[in-house]
A protein has these predicted regions:
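Active-site and adjacent substrate-binding regions of carbohydrate-active enzymes
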Residues: 1-364
Length: 365
């Protein structure tokens, strides 16, 4: 029956998330094998399939599904909807499979028009190098953007004892009024490749090597160069399982401009779970950072100083008036010194960091 042989000029435009072509051959009861677009992973066991299948956004049935899903989410009381990997949705023969312009932004606008009447705010999730300025495009169009630069910048600042790159990014957020949602660890990996154009490439490579040396993992790239990847590790293990570094990182996150979100495993100082990776088998690298915690695990973790102090930082960020809407944020950083200050009326909060000493202080009104 032959093979699908893509034109090399088309392949060069592709942005792959797994080895091989993003195509899954689905066998129908009549014996026909039909190719379906499949950007992300798949498992095939005879006639059984497990994975993520791309939707045809030109189909009215798909838009009916979007409408029903957004209505259901809104009925549950949701306020923010994350659009996971949305930039892979628009594609057409002869074009890229990722971030097509203007189709990507037209698609996002269509989703916005469905979500806004329901009181839903969209949070588009997109990984791209800093140098591509996609975060800026999202901001200019009025959307919040994930701060995928912060996790790597914080590790760089702590390990290399310098505030320069972190402070530069924080100032850009403030000066350009970019609305962000930030994190340290998350359900996926640490997105160091996103730092291209912000951090020197040799330094990015060194950070990847450092985290891997501390037990982190990178998926098997099968020798391909145009595959995006993250470094899979808990943030605590990426920092060498150092309580002081974890607390410093969390303090920086709480003062960083934007809305902080916290991955449960880092809050409880979770370590790389290599046993979970082993149980998951091939392509199970993400399980390193997804350990299931029992109630007793959590009760035991709450006794740890590193957990209690992180919770104190979260309470401060949630309750102190300096962090309320309308605050004026001032960032200064050079060499090993960093300061971030919030002023809101008579309330203020000031973080000062000495990366050389690996220490921080917080002053509150």
């Amino acid at each position: 029956e032959g093979y699908i042989q893509p034109d090399e000029s088309c392949l060069k435009q592709m942005f792959f998330r797994k080895p091989g072509l993003p195509i899954l051959m689905v066998e129908f009861p009549d014996g026909r094998r039909v190719p379906y677009w499949n950007t992300f992973y798949q498992e095939v066991h005879g006639r059984d399939y497990l994975g993520q299948m791309d939707l045809n956004i030109k189909s009215e049935k798909v838009w009916d599904f979007y409408r029903e899903t957004l209505k259901k989410i809104a009925s549950y009381g949701a306020a923010i909807v994350r659009l996971d990997a949305f930039a892979y949705a628009p594609k057409a023969p002869g074009k890229k499979n990722f971030l097509n312009d203007p189709e990507t932004w037209e698609f996002l606008q269509q989703i916005h028009e469905l979500a806004a009447p329901l009181g839903l705010t969209l949070l588009p999730e997109i990984h791209a190098a800093y140098e591509e300025k996609i975060y800026k495009t999202l901001a200019d169009k009025g959307y919040a953007t994930y701060d995928f630069f912060l996790p790597g910048l914080v590790i760089d600042a702590i390990e290399n004892r310098r505030a320069d790159y972190l402070a530069k990014w924080a100032r850009e957020i403030v000066e350009d009024k970019i609305s962000t949602v930030n994190m340290l660890g998350c359900h996926d990996g640490i997105p160091l490749l996103d730092l291209k154009g912000l951090l020197p490439e040799d330094d990015i490579r060194s950070l990847i090597d450092l985290i891997v040396s501390r037990g982190g993992m990178v998926k098997n790239l099968h020798g391909q160069k145009n595959i995006y990847y993250q470094v899979n590790a808990t943030y605590y293990s990426a920092l060498g399982e150092s309580d002081s570094k974890m607390l410093l990182a969390r303090a920086i996150q709480m003062f960083m401009p934007g809305k902080p979100q916290v991955w449960y495993l880092d809050l409880f100082a979770g370590k790389n779970d290599h046993e979970a990776v082993r149980r998951a088998g091939e392509s199970g690298h993400k399980e390193i950072n997804r350990t299931n915690l029992s109630a007793s695990d959590i009760e035991e973790a709450l006794k740890k100083d590193v957990v209690a102090k992180q919770l104190e930082l979260l309470r401060m960020r949630n309750t102190h008036k300096a962090f309320e809407k309308g605050a004026v944020i001032t960032v200064a950083g050079e060499g090993p010194k960093l300061s971030i200050r919030y002023d809101n009326g008579e309330a203020y909060a000031l973080l000062t960091v000495d990366f050389e000493a690996g220490a921080y202080e917080i002053e509150l009104s």
